[in-house]
Amino acid sequence: MVDNQGPLAKDVSLANPPSDSISELSWSPVANHLAMSSWDQTVRIYDVSQSGNGEGQALFNFPAPVLSCTFSPDGAKVLGGATDGSARLMDLVAGKEAQQVAAHDAPVRCVRFFGNPGVRDPIAVTGSWDQTVKYWDLRQDRPLATLQCQERVYAMDLCQNLLVVATAGRLVHVVQLSNADQIYKTVTSPLKHQTRTVTCIPDASGFAIGSTEGRTGFHYVDESKSSLNFTFRCHREMAASKNTQNVYAVNDVSFHPKYYTFSTAGADGTFAFWDKDAHHRLKSFPSVGAPITSTGFNHDGTIFAYAVSYDWSKGFRYNTPEHPTRVVCHPVDDVDCRPKNPVKR
């Protein structure tokens, strides 16, 4: 679906997208480089211009579908986690084949880096369906530490000293990375159905969580801020029959790096921008015609990327060759993301 005149009129689709569902998008923290992992067993990196046009910079092949990808703090490396239980490192400077740097006993669902931009060798963090999170020094073949979770890792994110791990059974493990081998506390998701995504608030004060029930929640780590916790409904529409709603999964939540406002995107093919402090929707956008599986703002918040592809919500039979697969760059109008009453930080 192309919106030639409305709020999506300036959106640009990147050339040569993956041939199968896109599992995750990841922007470089320091440049307009966009990585995407896919079920087609690749990780692709694009150099995106400010206008949203992108040029392929690198393509790395994996031996299995890739479920997650992330940039290193300096933007020079990309880590990918695959269904064969491996995580592989791609060095964009050296340009060599992806090298295995981590291993699990089940698919690697999520990968992140722990380290500041000035750190030469950041720590890789991998979360798996084998119910563990492992920390890796990329110069060694054994994990530095292993965190035993209560269930399979479904989603994971990291910001500053905060690691949040969402598992099966609606559990959420909160880890303070100053004590990375210990779970600081475990909470039950405020949402009643399966977790689809978890994203740290940029100031590391808490996290946002999305589920299959068309609902998003916010939870703060400090219990003195528990009064600020809240949930809200989104990605729903009225059905043809009265008093009935079609409910869609919230597939991703992304934060604007400057304003800390955020986006939600769902299986209904729509995305919206929100103000968490005012509990207010800033801007909604029309459907793009297929599920949105992953999203992300670039490092300065001027470009919003979203992946359109099958999200597996109806099983493998519906993943047909006719299903659209593309990555789109949306130029962000500052007024769409700027809160009406900014909070001093």
From Swiss-Prot:
InterPro entries: WD40/YVTN_repeat-like_dom_sf, WD40_repeat_dom_sf, WD40_rpt. The keyword Repeat applies. Coiled coil: none annotated. Pathway: Secondary metabolite biosynthesis. Induction: Expression is positively regulated by the oxaleimides biosynthesis cluster-specific transcription factor poxB. Keywords: Repeat, WD repeat. WD repeats lie at residues 15-49, 59-100, 101-146, 250-284. The keyword Transit peptide does not apply. It comes from the Eukaryota. Belongs to the WD repeat rae1 family. WD40 repeat protein; part of the gene cluster that mediates the biosynthesis of oxaleimides, cytotoxic compounds containing an unusual disubstituted succinimide moiety. The first step of the pathway is provided by the HR-PKS poxF that serves in a new mode of collaborative biosynthesis with the PKS-NRPS poxE, by providing the olefin containing amino acid substrate via the synthesis of an ACP-bound dec-4-enoate. This is WD40 repeat protein poxJ.
